[in-house]
């Protein structure tokens, strides 16, 4: 069984729904054993961007890293196109939309850790990820304290 720490994020107007849908998709590919729930974060790379919603999932899966990465990136691309089409008459079909303004991320799905190996060091040290890990750590202490 493999264990993945997956970070979801969006700052689009329909971002909360996009994150909820992504959680359901991720759950189809294994068992979610921990979940921060959605939490707000400030944009780190473009101060003009709207606030983000993020969520970290811990997934146990039989899939290998290549397969999980491929299906999450395929889902991400499909949903970004759908959201961009719905929200922008100019159709931003890239990773994000940036039309005369701030960067808007429809949905971002990143496998940050895989079986204890850090795959995305920049995400691992980012405030949005550290905040989620802090939430997960708090959940662990509540569960342990209840025992």
Write out the residue ranges for each language-model feature.
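Flexible, gly/pro- and Lys/Arg-enriched active-site loops
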Residues: 44-51, 66-69, 74-147
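Active-site microenvironments that recognize anionic phosphate/pyrophosphate groups
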Residues: 6-12, 16
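Extreme N-terminal starter segment of soluble prokaryotic enzymes
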Residues: 1-5
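Short beta-strand-to-loop capping motifs
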Residues: 8-10, 57-63, 113-116
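Short, surface-exposed acidic-centric catalytic microdomains
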Residues: 17-65
């Amino acid at each position: 069984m493999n264990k993945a720490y997956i970070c979801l994020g969006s700052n689009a107007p329909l971002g909360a729904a996009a994150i909820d849908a992504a959680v359901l998709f991720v759950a189809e590919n294994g068992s979610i054993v921990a979940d921060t729930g959605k939490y707000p974060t400030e944009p780190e790379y473009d101060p003009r961007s709207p606030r983000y919603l993020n969520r970290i999932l811990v997934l146990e899966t039989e899939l290998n890293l290549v397969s999980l990465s491929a299906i999450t990136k395929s889902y991400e691309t499909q949903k970004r196109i759908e959201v961009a089409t719905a929200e922008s008459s100019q159709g931003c079909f890239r990773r994000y939309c940036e039309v005369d303004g701030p960067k808007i991320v429809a949905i971002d799905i990143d496998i940050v850790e895989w079986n204890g190996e850090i795959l995305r060091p920049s995400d691992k040290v980012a405030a949005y990820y550290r905040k989620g890990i802090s939430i997960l750590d708090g959940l662990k202490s509540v569960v342990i304290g209840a025992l």
